[in-house]
Amino acid sequence: MVNQSLEQALELSLFLPFAVFRNPFTFIYTQTYPLPSPSTIVGILQKSLNRFDLYDKWKKHEIDVSVKGNYQSVFTHYVRKIKGELYFDNSILNKVSRDKEPEILLNSDRKPVFEQEIYSLELLIHIKTDQQLLEELYKKLSKPQSIISVGRAENIAFYLREPKFVDIQENASDQESVTLKYSTYAKPSHLKDSEKYLSLSFLEVSYAKDKDLYYSVFAGVDRPVPSQIERFYKLNFLEKGQEFFLKDLQGVEFLKIENELEPIFWINYED
């Protein structure tokens, strides 16, 4: 029997009736990521504490997050996009200026867009950081002062279970393999053969209120316009039911769910 080294993490179990985590690389047919990005989760934590230094802590590897979830289906619906400004007569128009000519008003841009949306999403989120910060997050998230939304405001979340502390172990005892109970994100470095699994690209944007304060791309709070594209990065998406031999996993910890071990793929900021 392998000796187990245990540490605590904060667990959030959320239900979203509908959700869109828009892939910024898609346009006329806008697609959704299957789960929220890690920075989206950091944004929820920032909003709960009403402070904006957690993103920097995540960048410094002082906070790790794990994003898991299962959903019932993904459907596509039709959206009519209208771009313009509302004027006194309730018409929607665009201002257009040309070289050395006065501004003129033209009809607004209108175009059809197809958009993916997730139906009936259950999220299982884990956060690992220092004990004091975990206690602060637990206190605030146990009694939220406002509606919890994951990413965009329409992605309203409800607790399936109250936030709680769980024990995370470094080893998987004497097991040779594990089967995922939840779909999850993993870093390519977690997997021996990461090229075998679906790879998704993410875009990270920094928001600067002043030179010392930065906001997460999905902070979910009032914030200034993006100041710069910070980085592109890739994560693997692993689906529920996939089996993995432990020898093919690297830097992974484990959680007991219904007396069975579930791998936890910690995601932190990597330059």
Q: Model-derived features: where do they sit?
A:
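N-terminal, well-ordered alpha-helical segments
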Residues: 43-47, 65, 80
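Internal, well-folded beta-alpha domain core
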Residues: 70-271
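N-terminal ordered "arm"
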Residues: 2-56
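Extracellular structured ligand-interaction cores
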Residues: 7-9, 62-64, 120-124
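Active-site helix-to-loop segments that bind/position phosphate- or nucleotide-bearing substrates
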Residues: 52, 58-70
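Preference for bulky hydrophobic residues occupying beta-strand positions
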Residues: 12-14, 67, 125-127
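General N-terminal targeting signals
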Residues: 27-31, 38, 52, 58, ...
